[in-house]
Amino acid sequence: MAGPCPLVEDSCSRLPSQSNVYGLAALPGAGGLLAATLKGKVLHFRYQHLRHKLRPVARELQFTYIPVDAEIVSIGCFQKSAPKRGLVVGITFIKDSGDKPSPFLNIYCDYEPGCEFDLDSVAQSCLNLELRFTPLQLCHAEVHIGDRCDTVFLLSGTDPGIHLYRENEGLHQFEEQPLHELFPELQELPSSALWLDVCTVPSSRRRLTAVGCQSGYVRVAHVDQDTRAVLQSWSIQQDGPISTVLLFPLEEPDDDGDVAGGHRGADDVGPSAPGPEPTPHYSLLVASTIEMSVVYRDVLSRGLTEQLSLPGSDHHDAVLCAMLACTALDGGREVLLGTYGQELLCYAYRGRRCGFQLLWTRRFPGPVLALCGADLTGDGLREVAVGCLQGLHVLQHSLEPTAQRLKERLRREVARRAQQRGGEGTGTPK
């Protein structure tokens, strides 16, 4: 039996028109969120100190070269990889040109010193690219080129294919570059990619790439970033369109319910145990529009052979979005699913024998289209931004349970260190 949601709604901002599953993007740091609507409007949502209080503020940004009759499809943003500086925003839209709609990708980036992170300045510095396909998801990924890192846009389309856009430093603009040179694992997809997820394996020069397609095809690849060699690749075929895929570390819980192996969630509180960070065991969440959502455990060791179901995930119409959170503040990761049936579902991993269990649900006034985690208030804990059909809801941790959890972890840490000192004092000298 699912319990109540431990998060409280801190704010709700109405959108000027409806959004979609690709319409929410987190700005780096505490910069807030960008929410795009179908009728060509982009809102900047953030928390601001007003009259000695922290208040949510939403204002429209005036991005240039977006026609009044344009329909925004997707939005994405990233901060340039060091040593380069600056914020990059990408917006795809379709312009109604009468007989035939015209798709475009606008990339915004200001090269004027002192304006690289000013959103209003960035919104006026546009590169307009006409597309030969209908755009879908716009995301970004970091690539290693020699001894340098660079961040690129990846745009899926209905051609079907995935297109790569990288900055040409000499020309001070972005341009499309061949996909196979940097992402050979994303070639020759059988249908349009609805969702793509790329993550770098910590303390390595390798990455994992997952893609889910409209035909139900799912592919996961393990790639050497230096040589671009595909070290391992797995694929499966499901019955319906894949709405989202998500790669994430999944560790075995210990007897206290906390995560073993030293891996800490983004919202974990309290000190961590000393020692090197272990390499996480990556698992893959696959959400389908007509089937139950599943997690393939430890893909690097087991491929796509060990499947764990998320019970009840198919009871609320299609699953549209997913993200990781740490609502229990136990160092583990919960999986959040947003559904067209207006429910937000939270699942926790209870070990190999019990698998995933439904922790809590929360209902919203409309379909849950997009989820995004970000520290919007600057308190060190990540809020959960929930994008619904015509509104943006922000959920945050309750203060009292969070403070209590912090005290518990501090007590355990003090006891652990006292036990270590006692053991050292009674050791036998050599």
Curated annotation (Swiss-Prot):
Keywords: Actin-binding, Cell projection, Lysosome, Membrane. Residues 256-277 are annotated as: Disordered. It comes from the Eukaryota. Signal peptide: none annotated. GO terms for cellular component: actin cytoskeleton; KICSTOR complex; lamellipodium; lysosomal membrane; stereocilium. Its main location: membrane. It is found in: Lysosome membrane; Cell projection, Lamellipodium; Cell projection, Stereocilium. GO terms for biological process: actin filament organization; cellular response to amino acid starvation; cellular response to glucose starvation; negative regulation of TORC1 signaling; protein localization to lysosome. One of its GO terms (molecular function) is actin filament binding. InterPro entries: Kptn. PANTHER family: KICSTOR COMPLEX PROTEIN KAPTIN (PTHR15435:SF2). As part of the KICSTOR complex may function in the amino acid-sensing branch of the TORC1 signaling pathway. May be part of the KICSTOR complex. This is KICSTOR complex protein kaptin.
